[in-house]
Structure formats: structure tokens, C-alpha cells
From Swiss-Prot:
The active site is at S207, D345, H376. Belongs to the AB hydrolase superfamily. AB hydrolase 4 family. Acylglycerol lipase activity is activated upon binding to progesterone. It comes from Macaca fascicularis (Crab-eating macaque). The gene is ABHD2. The keyword Nucleus does not apply. It is found in: Cell membrane. Glycans are attached at N136, N410. The chain crosses the membrane at residues 10-30. Residues 1-9 are cytoplasmic. Progesterone-dependent acylglycerol lipase that catalyzes hydrolysis of endocannabinoid arachidonoylglycerol (AG) from cell membrane. Acts as a progesterone receptor: progesterone-binding activates the acylglycerol lipase activity, mediating degradation of 1-arachidonoylglycerol (1AG) and 2-arachidonoylglycerol (2AG) to glycerol and arachidonic acid (AA). Also displays an ester hydrolase activity against acetyl ester, butanoate ester and hexadecanoate ester. The lineage of its organism: Eukaryota, Metazoa, Chordata, Craniata, Vertebrata. This is Monoacylglycerol lipase ABHD2. It catalyses: Hydrolyzes glycerol monoesters of long-chain fatty acids; an acetyl ester + H2O = an aliphatic alcohol + acetate + H(+); a triacylglycerol + H2O = a diacylglycerol + a fatty acid + H(+); 2-(5Z,8Z,11Z,14Z-eicosatetraenoyl)-glycerol + H2O = glycerol + (5Z,8Z,11Z,14Z)-eicosatetraenoate + H(+). GO terms for biological process: acrosome reaction; acylglycerol catabolic process; medium-chain fatty acid biosynthetic process; medium-chain fatty acid catabolic process; negative regulation of smooth muscle cell migration; response to progesterone; response to wounding; smooth muscle cell migration.
Length: 425
């Protein structure tokens, strides 16, 4: 009798277990996908000035909500992973010409040149000089998507191919790209200035490329001639301060570090003969490179210490990171500068964001833009599941560049009017 009374309770118990399991799974999904996070306009850090007021009026994306895809877009990890594996959705194939420049040390630098597909909104000749992220080049999907959009908005685009990054271009000297070497980017900019003497420049850098372009502009005042503005997206500002955070498991940074190190090893070893071959006349600093340590490296810091710093003869990793980071050059940039990071970027620790925040509080030419979501170079947009081909980042950079071009045009017209009035008096 007791058994007969107890059996009906068993299904209820099992249903309770199932319900608890489903609830646990849903909780994990909500937490992992960050579904409870709100959508909001980006946080903006700037000084009140005529320029900042004009930008807020002319760039709607600065004050509108950035709305990522509903299901997964609020996860910085998924945004970053999709950028890393997929690049972009339905990426176009812009047509350009590859240019070759022989550097003073025998290295062969390359960049791709893309002509505008429409007239610019202010009618001027404007060239975007673009520096991609680590080990990237003009054939990467996120670069192709951005270039195509910029072309359609009237920009000529010059995209640097990092030294050693293109698989079909051999190194012609025992040197490849490093974290902050500006030689190749500077050579590309000088080529553009010489070939198109009437053009004005918009400087754009993504991730590591953001460090390079900011360092380039701050190295000497002459590098800012003909430059209308600069945009840096998702850089970390200081390799020295970032190295400790990049070894932490928080936000899986140690795992990302391992993946990036593995990719760098493959690139370096693909050029082992040009870099380390017995027939190569290489600098003394490379002579003692222990390739066995490169094979076993599991972090970018180990690779930088064993190989990368030696390309430029740095005596220590600390010296390499101090000299190659743009942080010590940012205060020397006088052209309008927009720094963009995502709050959920798993590669850039929040402590590093104090650098652009502090700079924007001191300099009227600097605006720091910090959306809640976007990951590392993701910034996908879309309604529910599938992302759009064009990202929020692509649109923001072009919108900002257009606004700066208009700002400069207005200043020029005001100056001309004042000159006419002075002549009449």
C-alpha cells in the first residue's frame, strides 16, 4: 500500500530535476552570452570644445545606441572569435594595385593602393593610410570590408602589408614587422605624399596597427603634415603594462595569448631561412637566437624576448616594450585623434583604458570612444542571429573622417571670408 502511494511522486521528482537542469543551463547561457547587459550609446571622454561639439552634431553613431546581434553580440568572446575566424560576412573584394618599396636595410615593404569609387563629400582628394592588426595585411576580410566602404565614400586607401605577413611575399632581409616599428608605414605615407601632392591624409590603425600609427605621428611633427586626423581602434597603448595582464586567465587572456603566439611562431618559422639561415648576413643580436626556445614558446612575450626585440637590437624585453609602445608619444599628436576600444574586449584589460581616458581629459584634440560591446575588432551589428556585412566600427571611422573633413573645410572657408573682409577694409 505504501509503495503504491509513493510511486506517483517519482515523476514529479524527475520533473523537478529536469527543470533545475534546464534552469542551470539557461543561467549559464545568459551569463556566457551576457544577455542581461543593456544596449547603450558608447561612453565618450573628451573636453568641451568647438571640435567636440561639431563631432557630436555630425557623428550620430557617437550618441546612438550600438546594437549588436541579440543572441550572441553582447559576448566579447564571441565577437572576438567571429572576427578571428570569419573576419566579416560576405566580404567584398576591392580591386587595388600592389606597390613595392625597397627599404634601406634591403627589406621589401609592400602596400596595396585602392582608388576611390565615388566623389568625396567635400570634393577633396583624401587618402586613408591604413595599418592593420598583428600579422595582418590587405587581404584580410575585415580590411577588405573597410576599404570597400571607404572607397564608396570617396577615399583613396593605402593599406600596409606587415613585413612577413603575406604568405606569398618572401623576406629580402633578416627582419620582419614588430610591435612598434614605423619604418614601413612611414615609407608608405611618404610614397602617397610624393605621388599625390594635393592629397590630405586620414590615418587609421587597427589593434597593433593603432600603436604603430600613433607612434609614427608622435615621433616627429613633420609626420603630421597633411594629416587631417587619426583613428585608432582596439589597441592596448602600452605593451609593458599589458604584458602582466596578458598572462592572466581572467577573460581567457592567457588562452588568447597562446593562440596568437602559435600563429606568430608559424609566420616566423615560415621565414626561417631568410631570418636565421647560415647564408644570411644578419645583425649580431640575431646570431644567438635559440630556435628551440621559439618552438616551445607559449606566449607572445616569450617570442618577443627570444626573437622580435632582436630585430632592432634591444637589450631587454622591458626596453623593447618601452620604446615600441605609443604611450610615450600620444601627447605629441596635435591633429584630431579618436581612440576606440570596447569595454568587453577580452584582449585589452580595463586598466589599460586609463591611458586614453587620461589623455582625453588633457587634450582638446582627443576623443575616447568606449562602447559596452564589440569585443576585439568585432563590432558586428544585426537583428537577432546573423550579422550584417558592415560593422559599427567601419561606419564610425568613415563618419568621423567625413566630419573632420567638413570641419577643416568650414575652417578654411571662415579663414577665406575673414581675409576678404580684411582686404575690403
Amino acid at each position: 500500500m505504501n509503495a503504491m502511494l509513493e510511486t506517483p511522486e517519482l515523476p514529479a521528482v524527475f520533473d523537478g530535476v529536469k527543470l533545475a537542469a534546464v534552469a542551470a543551463v539557461l543561467y549559464v547561457i545568459v551569463r556566457c552570452l551576457n544577455l542581461k547587459s543593456p544596449t547603450a550609446p558608447p561612453d565618450l571622454y573628451f573636453q568641451d570644445s568647438g571640435l567636440s561639439r561639431f563631432l557630436l552634431k555630425s557623428c550620430p553613431l557617437l550618441t546612438k545606441e550600438y546594437i549588436p546581434p541579440l543572441i550572441w553580440g553582447k559576448s566579447g568572446h564571441i565577437q572576438t572569435a567571429l572576427y578571428g575566424k570569419m573576419g566579416r560576412v560576405r566580404s567584398p573584394h576591392p580591386y587595388g594595385h600592389r606597390k613595392f618599396i625597397t627599404m634601406s636595410d634591403g627589406a621589401t615593404s609592400t602596400f596595396d593602393l585602392f582608388e576611390p569609387l565615388a566623389e568625396h563629400c567635400v570634393g577633396d582628394d583624401i587618402t586613408m593610410v591604413i595599418c592593420p592588426g598583428i600579422a595582418n595585411h590587405s587581404e584580410k576580410q575585415y580590411i577588405r570590408t573597410f576599404v570597400d566602404y571607404a572607397q564608396k565614400n570617396g577615399y583613396r586607401c593605402a593599406v600596409l602589408n606587415h613585413l612577413g605577413a603575406l604568405p606569398n611575399i618572401e623576406l629580402t632581409s633578416p627582419r620582419m614587422f614588430t610591435y612598434g616599428c614605423t619604418w614601413e608605414f612611414g615609407a608608405m605615407v611618404n610614397y602617397i605624399k610624393k605621388t599625390y601632392p594635393l592629397t590630405q591624409l586620414v590615418v587609421v590603425g587597427f589593434s597593433l596597427g593603432g600603436n604603430i600609427v600613433c607612434k609614427y605621428l608622435g615621433e616627429t611633427q613633420a609626420n603630421q603634415e597633411k594629416v587631417l586626423c587619426c583613428v585608432s581602434v582596439c589597441q592596448g597603448y602600452s605593451a609593458l603594462r599589458a604584458q602582466e595582464t596578458f598572462m592572466q586567465w581572467d577573460q581567457c587572456r592567457r588562452f588568447y595569448n597562446f593562440l596568437m603566439a602559435d600563429n606568430m611562431k608559424k609566420i616566423i618559422l615560415s621565414h626561417r631561412q631568410a631570418l636565421f639561415g647560415d647564408h644570411v648576413k644578419k645583425p649580431q643580436s640575431l646570431e644567438d637566437t635559440d630556435l628551440s626556445r621559439l618552438y616551445t614558446a607559449t606566449s607572445l612575450m616569450q617570442i618577443d624576448d627570444n626573437v622580435m626585440r632582436k630585430f632592432h637590437g634591444y637589450n631587454s624585453l622591458k626596453e623593447y616594450y618601452e620604446e615600441e609602445s605609443c604611450m610615450r608619444y600620444l601627447h605629441r599628436i596635435y591633429v584630431p585623434l579618436m581612440l576606440v576600444n570596447a569595454a568587453d574586449d577580452p584582449l585589452v584589460h580595463e586598466s589599460l583604458l586609463t591611458i586614453p581616458k587620461s589623455l582625453s581629459e588633457k587634450r582638446e584634440n582627443v576623443m575616447f570612444v568606449l562602447p559596452l560591446h564589440g569585443g576585439h575588432l568585432g563590432f558586428f551589428e544585426g537583428s537577432v542571429l546573423f550579422p550584417e556585412p558592415l560593422t559599427w566600427m567601419d561606419k564610425l571611422v568613415v563618419e568621423y573622417a567625413n566630419a573632420i573633413c567638413q570641419w577643416e573645410r568650414n575652417k578654411s572657408q571662415c579663414s577665406d571670408t575673414e581675409q576678404v573682409e580684411a582686404d575690403l577694409e
